[in-house]
Amino acid sequence: MNYDANPIHILFNDENLKQRLLALIVGNNTPSGTTFNALCFHIRQQAIDDHAVADPDGTVYTNDELAPEDQLRVSRLLWELIWEHKVFLLFGRSALLGLSNGEDRFVKY
């Protein structure tokens, strides 16, 4: 068994990754939306579960982060979803909406 503490590089192509991001945002049908960190964590888990990571099978990942270049891809694809009016950014810090942690959220349009 191999252990890897490096950020995880995912192998999803842009279209597949974009659809996964949209599904996560739409599937979280709450007014408070989903944070960037939560989206990246779920994408990381999906990539591990689907064997779509750059490291060989049997690797135990000890880092919760996507590789920096994949975080940039996620960010760019989220902006595409915003421009397509499929999601929007929820700004604000309302404890009533559960927005007290300082992170803006992505919500289904």
Where are these regions (language model features)?
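Short alpha-helical segments that sit at the start of domains
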Residues: 1-45
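Short, cationic-aromatic polyanion-contact patches
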Residues: 92-109
